[in-house]
Amino acid sequence: MEQNIVFGIDVSSHSSTVCVVIDRIKQGKPFTISNDSFGYQKLLDHLNRYLITPLVVFESTGVYSLSLQAFLEENHIKYLKLNPLKAKKLMDNN
């Protein structure tokens, strides 16, 4: 059975916090990356540790998430960009 690996990213203005979840179980402690080429390389290094490509999930935070989205697209990494209002509504209903 194939694992479901998700990298959840909380994007802020200067840095982002990354949490890894495998089959709905949080793996270790979240880590922080800078929102620049050095931070994105660190993210790529973590993504490449897995045999299957993880799905990256993040909220659309306007200008703050644009560089992350561009990086993911350039590197052909699957991602899901959430509408923040819909994400909050989903969380409030659970």
Roles of regions detected by a PLM:
Residues 1-94:
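Phosphate- and other anionic-substrate recognition elements at nucleic-acid/protein interfaces
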